């Protein structure tokens, strides 16, 4: 009898240990950054001035590589207090290449530097011991490099970074080249099922044209499956990114619409005025997106870059009639705050528990002591939400 009891006891212990391992292994972890802007320099970094983006990104990559050995903060979030462990994905929401306005380098040079630094420098592995997977969307700089801009660029167009992102994410049977890639036919819109969550990755912003693709994509998703949108622009968009409503609808210095979205601006815009002025009103277009959100209440969160600072907030729409949990990422090169104070440089770690459909986003401050560049990253803000 005692022998049988002991066997049962050991079996229960084995099961408990197994369930603990499964619980940890079932979590999904994503490093999230944005606007890495290869091709320009930071005013100051680590005691030096005019520091190239290559140098800054290599330092950020080194900080990312330390994540698996760090312990998560005791913030009541997913896996709080546990060792981070494997990282499954790296998510970058665009502006990999800076716009090639002199003296910035070409998109081709920037894309090549990105590949070299990240592909060779990142050592992070997923739960199966494989190199992590990239989740990329283009930014306004990547796309302007490809289709042109209203100020001088050298060369005038270079779609290399758009083509590179397209081939990495869309996996075409025949890889696109700079000669065979065309906009808007070759948008970078795709989705992934990650931990029981449907992630939608969108070119620039979910305008009316992109929402046609999104609607079709969501038609295959059960209404009870949580959905997350990932794009470069914030939920309130950027009015300058729409198609020019004037004249030939082109990209020109007078109107300063950038033509990055297929949807034509329908809002009355303020006069441009000063030389660097640009369109600012996109309330009409936002209302179309809000209607889409209301039609799909399983859209639970939105991740983006473009504005260049770390923020966890709620998007409420131009009429304050929707509530979408939103996460904005810092830029290592052009941070609104971190460009002036490098101790505020950050990326985010997203940890997802697929069983409870819970997501925690944690700010990771990676340069809090510039005098000691190898110092481990420090946890900042965190936010946990149910999906």
Q: Where are these predicted regions, by residue range?
A:
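Active-site-proximal segments of metal-dependent phosphoesterases and phosphodiesterases across multiple
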Residues: 211, 222-299
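Bacterial N-terminal signal peptides that target proteins for export
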Residues: 1-10
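Short mixed-charge
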Residues: 67-86, 120-131, 174-179, 288
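N-terminal active-site segment of His-dependent metallophosphoesterases
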Residues: 23-106
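Active-site neighborhood of phospho(di)ester-bond hydrolases with catalytic His/Asp-centered motifs
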Residues: 32-34, 88-95, 130-139, 202-203, ...
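Bacterial N-terminal signal peptides
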Residues: 9-18
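Extended active-site neighborhood of metal-dependent phosphoesterases/phosphodiesterases
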Residues: 99-215, 219-226, 251-267, 295, ...
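Short, solvent-exposed loop/turn elements at domain surfaces
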Residues: 28-30, 38-44, 209-213, 335-340, ...
């Amino acid at each position: 009898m005692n022998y049988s009891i002991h066997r049962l006891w050991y079996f229960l212990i084995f099961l408990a240990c197994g369930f603990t391992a499964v619980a940890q292994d079932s979590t999904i972890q994503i490093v999230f950054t944005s606007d890495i802007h290869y091709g320009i320099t930071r005013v100051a970094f680590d005691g030096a001035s005019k520091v190239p983006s290559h140098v800054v990104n290599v330092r950020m990559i080194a900080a990312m590589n330390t994540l698996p050995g760090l312990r998560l903060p005791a913030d009541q979030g997913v896996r709080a207090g546990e060792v981070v462990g494997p990282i499954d994905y790296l998510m970058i929401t665009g502006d990999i290449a800076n716009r090639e306005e002199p003296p910035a380098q070409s998109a081709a040079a920037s894309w090549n530097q990105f590949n070299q630094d990240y592909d060779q420098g990142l050592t992070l592995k997923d739960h199966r011991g494989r190199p992590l997977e990239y989740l990329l969307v283009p930014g306004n700089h990547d796309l302007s490099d490809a289709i042109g801009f209203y100020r001088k660029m050298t060369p005038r167009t270079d779609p290399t970074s758009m083509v590179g992102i397209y081939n990495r994410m869309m996996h075409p049977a025949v890889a696109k080249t700079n000669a065979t890639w065309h906009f808007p036919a070759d948008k970078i819109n795709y989705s992934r099922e990650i931990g029981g969550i449907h992630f939608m990755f969108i070119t620039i912003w979910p305008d009316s044209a992109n929402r046609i693709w999104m609607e079709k994509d969501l038609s295959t998703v059960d209404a009870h499956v949580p959905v997350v949108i990932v794009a470069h622009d914030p939920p309130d968009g950027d009015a300058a990114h729409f198609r020019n409503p004037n004249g030939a609808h082109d990209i020109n210095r007078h109107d300063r619409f950038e033509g990055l979205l297929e949807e034509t601006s329908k809002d009355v815009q303020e006069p441009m005025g000063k030389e660097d002025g640009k369109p600012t009103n996109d309330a009409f277009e936002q209302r179309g997106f809000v209607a889409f959100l209301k039609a799909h209440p399983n859209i639970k969160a939105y991740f983006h870059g473009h504005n260049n600072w770390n923020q966890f907030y709620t998007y409420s729409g131009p009429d304050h009639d929707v509530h979408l949990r939103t996460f904005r990422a810092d830029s290592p090169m052009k941070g609104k705050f971190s460009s002036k104070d490098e101790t505020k440089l950050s990326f985010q770690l997203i940890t997802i528990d697929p069983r409870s459909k819970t997501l925690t986003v944690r700010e990771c401050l990676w340069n809090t002591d510039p005098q000691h560049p190898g110092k481990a990253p420090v946890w900042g803000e965190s936010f946990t939400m149910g999906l």
